[in-house]
């Protein structure tokens, strides 16, 4: 599969999160083997702790949105709309700092590891854009249903 020609579409066209929960600044690179996105942590105001810091666990949301951007770009290559996915969990998550820096650009990367029956696993990293220092890493699993209407939603409206 070929890489999508730049410039890439804005993240808002690729991921379902909108408004203040749309946390990716832009797509940096993409091909079938993975996607890298830029993140401006200062824009993550809704996820800050009471003291104004940005907890390291927010890296998981950046990673999940990068996975969504990867899927959105692959769908776009096929002429299809982005599909909704659900974060299932993480393995081997490692946070090398207690809080994320607020005043410098970060780079998040998601690389697909395996897929089957709608369950996909990605190797993800979060680094400082300036020097490549790794801040967080882990494997994230997402579920992408074939048909949202077929999901048992219980008492949800």
Named regions from a protein language model:
Residues 3, 69, 100-104, 111-157:
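HotDog/MaoC-like acyl-thioester-processing domains
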Residues 8-18:
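Short aromatic-glycine motifs in intrinsically disordered, low-complexity regions
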Residues 22-25, 88, 108-110, 138:
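Small-residue-enriched segments and motifs
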Residues 16-23, 101-106:
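Short coil-to-beta-strand transition motifs
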Residues 51-70, 84-88:
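Compact, glycine-rich, soluble single-domain proteins
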Residues 26-29, 92, 97, 112-114, ...:
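A residue-level detector for short acidic-glycine micro-motifs
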Residues 19-55:
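Catalytic strand-loop segment that frames the active site of acyl-thioester-processing enzymes
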């Amino acid at each position: 599969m070929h890489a999508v020609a730049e410039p890439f579409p804005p993240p808002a066209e690729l991921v379902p999160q909108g408004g203040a929960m749309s946390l990716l600044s832009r797509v940096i690179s993409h091909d079938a083997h993975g996607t890298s996105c830029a993140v401006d942590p200062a824009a993550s105001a809704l996820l800050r702790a009471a003291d104004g810091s940005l907890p390291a666990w927010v890296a998981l949301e950046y990673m999940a949105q990068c996975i969504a951007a990867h899927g959105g770009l692959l769908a776009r290559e096929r002429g299809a709309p982005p599909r909704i996915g659900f974060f299932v969990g993480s393995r081997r998550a490692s946070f090398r700092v207690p809080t994320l820096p607020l005043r410098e650009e970060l780079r998040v990367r998601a690389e697909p590891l395996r897929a089957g029956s709608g369950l996909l696993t990605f190797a993800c990293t979060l680094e400082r854009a300036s020097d490549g220092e790794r801040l967080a890493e882990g494997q994230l699993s997402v579920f992408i249903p074939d048909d949202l209407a077929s999901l048992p939603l219980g008492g949800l409206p």
